[in-house]
Amino acid sequence: MGAVARALHRQNGWLRQNIELEAQSIASLSAGQLRARMTRYNAALLAAVDANASVLDTLYGPPPSWSWPTLTLPWQSTDRNVDIYNGLGSVWRHLAKDWSAEGHSGMRDLNARLTSMISDELRSNAPSSSPTVLLPGCGTGRLAWEVACALPEASVIGTDVSEAQLGVARHMLACTEPGSLTVHPWLDESRNNATDQSRLAALAVPDVAPGAAPANLSLQLVQPGAARLVPASAAAQQMDVVCTCFFLDCLPDTLAAVRAVRHARG
């Protein structure tokens, strides 16, 4: 997790440097009213970046002192998808989508439908008394947690190749207080913002308290190899149900991978 923390903090530092460079351009504006407005906006952006840095400290720990900041990102991977999902913007936006009230309102119906389909599948195939459900590409863990809550008799395994996403998932699942963190998910995205305030938008996470869930839930979060659904140590454990969302582009042959881990009657 140290390498991930270092990379994410560096990306946040790079964003801060870019905003500071914008401040230098603002200072050269001749129009006093516009300059004052842009100066206030720039200061608000810097404050939000610093607030996000504090959230990174909470999620991943502080960066080593020698790593702050640099314009060269150290996170190098041979897997394109790992690069994407370990990125700072991806971490913030997945966190907002899955664990804020505003984001989850758009996912609630989909997650409920997937959970219902899993339940129906388990009933119709009459698996063992302790069925196993695999959720590859689980990201920040919201769907995996909801499935585990809805099916306490099942063993739920969420996997993701991104250590950054799993770091968020583990922290969210341990939270016992809703709204314990506030994030600004769109600071690095200056496009598609109709107003100054939309880029500065702050969202409270999580919207629920997963850490207060019943202790009898069986939920594991694991990191497989980049081309696998499950770690090699768990490959022999075939699954009764494989359920995934936003994952079809992450494996060379998704169907073959699903067949390899699916139970014969699953």
Could you describe each region identified by the protein language model?
Residues M1-N125, L173-D196:
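N-terminal accessory regions of S-adenosyl-L-methionine
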Residues S129-G139, I157:
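Conserved class I S-adenosyl-L-methionine
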Residues T140-P152:
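Conserved SAM-binding loop of SAM-dependent methyltransferases across substrates and taxa
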Residues S162:
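Conserved SAM/SAH-binding beta-strand->alpha-helix loop
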Residues A169-R170:
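Conserved SAM-binding loop
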Residues L173-A232:
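S-adenosyl-L-methionine
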Residues D240-D253:
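A short SAM/SAH-binding and catalytic strip from SAM-dependent methyltransferases
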Residues L255-G266:
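A short glycine-rich, Lys/Arg-flanked "PGG" loop and its adjoining helix->strand segment in the class I
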